[in-house]
Amino acid sequence: MGQTWSPLTHAGAREAIALACRVLAHRGLADGILGHISLRIGENSLLVRCRGPQERGLAFTEASDIRLVDLDGNPAAEGELEGGYSAPNELPLHTELLRQRPDINAVVHAHPPRVVAADLAGLGIRPIVGAFDIPGTRLAAGGVPVYPRGVLVRNRQLAAEMLHAMGDRPVVLLRGHGLTSAAGSVEQAVLQAISVDTLAGLSLQVTSAGGALKDLPDSDMAELPDLGGSFNTQTAWRHELARISAAW
């Protein structure tokens, strides 16, 4: 294996993933103990949120809950899964994405109730808003694909089915289950999930009020500026971290 587990190995990345898990929970996308985030580390390994003997849920994730495993779920360094830690049952959901999508480095899997409810109600995630959430609108342009099976994605075959439904899109819904978001960074993957959840919530509100969902006109879409990564990701992420800091 070449190295021994230490909380100081990839310490910054472990802490970043732990904070991202807490953001998911604080935003209501990962209630309880379900959900996980991973980050590619090198060619054949990833840091992933694991479950230990004192599991308390994503809202209480610490850097020590983030462990380094290989693409088959084995410890990628000596001691990584010691202390009663285990990789998620749905690790193949992460590893198959990392195997097949070289464009992504981070994967988020969460169970947002509003996303599940909107999909079960037959409401697709569409670009129904404009400047309200420009990155979310662009993400939803053309719709967000759906993997139509409500299964636990616990093996490579099921993960391959999910990837087939996802195509080259950044997010896929899992019917009766949740969503998977993939991006170049942990922060971007979480922000994408938040945008999809927000659009799902708005869709439920609009239809509950008797309204009809309409896509943003192409002419309006063309007018939406690209505010750049420093605003769309970096500033937005500072806000998310400030929210959880204030909550604590």
Curated annotation (Swiss-Prot):
Q: Which gene encodes it?
A: phtC
Alphabetical GO CC annotations of the entry are: cytosol
Pathway annotation: Xenobiotic degradation; phthalate degradation
Biological process according to GO: pentose catabolic process
- Stored SUPFAM superfamilies: AraD/HMP-PK domain-like (SSF53639)
Upregulating conditions = Constitutively expressed.
Listed under catalytic activity are: 3,4-dihydroxyphthalate + H(+) = 3,4-dihydroxybenzoate + CO2
Q: Does the keyword Nuclease apply?
A: no
Give the positions the UniProt entry annotates as the active site.
E90
Provide the residue positions that the database annotates as binding a divalent metal cation.
E90, H109, H111, H177
Q: Which cofactor does it need?
A: a divalent metal cation
Q: Which UniProt keywords apply?
A: Lyase, Metal-binding, Plasmid
| Molecular function per GO | aldehyde-lyase activity; metal ion binding
Protein name as catalogued: 3,4-dihydroxyphthalate decarboxylase
Metal-binding listed as a keyword: yes
Catalytic activity, EC: 4.1.1.69
Protein task: Catalyzes the decarboxylation of 3,4-dihydroxyphthalate to protocatechuate (3,4-dihydroxybenzoate) during phthalate metabolism.
pH dependence as annotated: Optimum pH is 7.
Q: Which family does it belong to?
A: Belongs to the aldolase class II family.
| Signal sequence segment | none
Where does the sequence pass through the membrane?
none
Instruction: Give the top-level enzyme category.
Output: lyase
